[in-house]
Amino acid sequence: MTQTGKRQRRKFGRIRQFNSGRWQASYTGPDGRVYIAPKTFNAKIDAEAWLTDRRREIDRQLWSPASGQEDRPGAPFGEYAEGWLKQRGIKDRTRAHYRKLLDNHILATFADTDLRDITPAAVRRWYATTAVGTPTMRAHSYSLLRAIMQTALADDLIDSNPCRISGASTARRVHKIRPATLDELETITKAMPDPYQAFVLMAAWLAMRYGELTELRRKDIDLHGEVARVRRAVVRVGEGFKVTTPKSDAGVRDISIPPHLIPAIEDHLHKHVNPGRESLLFPSVNDPNRHLAPSALYRMFYKARKAAGRPDLRVHDLRHSGAVLAASTGATLAELMQRLGHSTAGAALRYQHAAKGRDREIAALLSKLAENQEM
C-alpha cells in the first residue's frame, strides 16, 4: 500500500489518503504518542468521524490508549502466512522454496504470534540467530518475512512493517566464483562420460542454466542456423520434475551457437540422442525419456573438475564462465543480458535492448577465442 503523501491539516488529528483511495486517520494522544485508526476508511467523512470520537473522549476525560482500537482484527502470523502462500501467483519451485523457508526458519519463532505483536525488536532478535551460517538462506528468509508483513500492512492488519533491517535482504557472496579457463574447460569436458561432454560445452559456451539444458530437446537445436532455442526449463518439485517456462520472460531466447561447437553438438545428436523431435539432449542416465537428476550429473562433474584441478568449481559456475568469455569479446552488458536470458527492472531502466543480430557476432568471436587457444 503506497501513500500519496497528501495530508489534511486539522485542529485535531491528521487524515491522509492512500493511492487505493482509502483514508487513514491518526492523532497524538494526551500521552504524546501517535495513534492510528485500526482500519482505513472508504470515505473521508468516516475518518473524520473516528477522529471526532477520539477528541470527544479526550475532552470528557474518557480516553485511554485502547480508545478506538477495539475493532482491530487479530491474526496469528502462521495462519496468515499459510493463506498468503496459497494465494500467491508464483511458480511451483518458488512456492516450495517459500514453504521450506517458513518451515525451517520463520514459523518456529512467529507462528503463534499475532501480526500486531511482531515488532522491529522482535524481528531483529529473530534475524540475529536465523541461518547465520548460510547468508543466502538468511536473506531469503528475511525477504519472505518482509513480503508477508507488507501484505498484512496493505490488508490493514498492522500499522507499519516491522522489517526494517537495512541490507538484510542481500546476501554477501561466500563462494567467490573463479571462472574456468579454456584449458580447464577442455579437461573437464574430456573427463566427462561421452553422453554428457556436450553438456559442459553448452553450459559454458552458451552460458545456459541447468534447467534449460536438461529440458533441451532435438527440436530446439538448429544446426543450419547455428541456434539453440530456449523455450522451456525443468525444475525439481518434490521427488519429481516439472516442465515450466524459463526463469524469466527474458529466459525465452535464441542463443547463437559458437561455430566451433557445431561439430561436437552434431556428433552428440548423432550418437547420444534418440530420434524424434521430442528426444532430450541430456536425459537421465538410465532412462532416455526422463530428465537428468542434478545428483547424477554432480557425481560425474565432481570427478571431471577434480581432473582439472578445480574442486571449487560448481556446475552453475560453467554459466558464469561462459558469461566472462562472452564479455571478453566486447559484448555490451545489454547484449550479455540477452544472451544469458537475465533481466531485472533496474537493468531494464539502465540499459537499452541488445542490438538484434549482435548475438551471432558474439558467438563467432567466441569461436575465435577457442581457435587462438588451439594455436
Swiss-Prot record:
Domain Tyr recombinase: 175-364
Entry's Gene Ontology molecular function annotations: DNA binding; site-specific recombinase activity
Gene3D superfamilies: 1.10.150.130, Intergrase catalytic core
InterPro entries assigned to the protein according to its UniProt record, in alphabetical order: CB, DNA_brk_join_enz, Integrase-like_cat_sf, Integrase_catalytic, Integrase_recombinase_N, Integrase_SAM-like_N, Tyrosine_recombinase_XerCD
Start and end residues of each Core-binding (CB) domain: 75-153
Assigned keywords, A-Z: DNA integration, DNA recombination, DNA-binding, Viral genome integration, Virus entry into host cell
Induction line: A possible member of the dormancy regulon. Induced in response to reduced oxygen tension (hypoxia). It is hoped that this regulon will give insight into the latent, or dormant phase of infection.
Function of the molecule: Integrase is necessary for integration of the phage into the host genome by site-specific recombination. In conjunction with excisionase, integrase is also necessary for excision of the prophage from the host genome.
Family: Belongs to the 'phage' integrase family.
Protein name stated in the entry: Putative prophage phiRv2 integrase
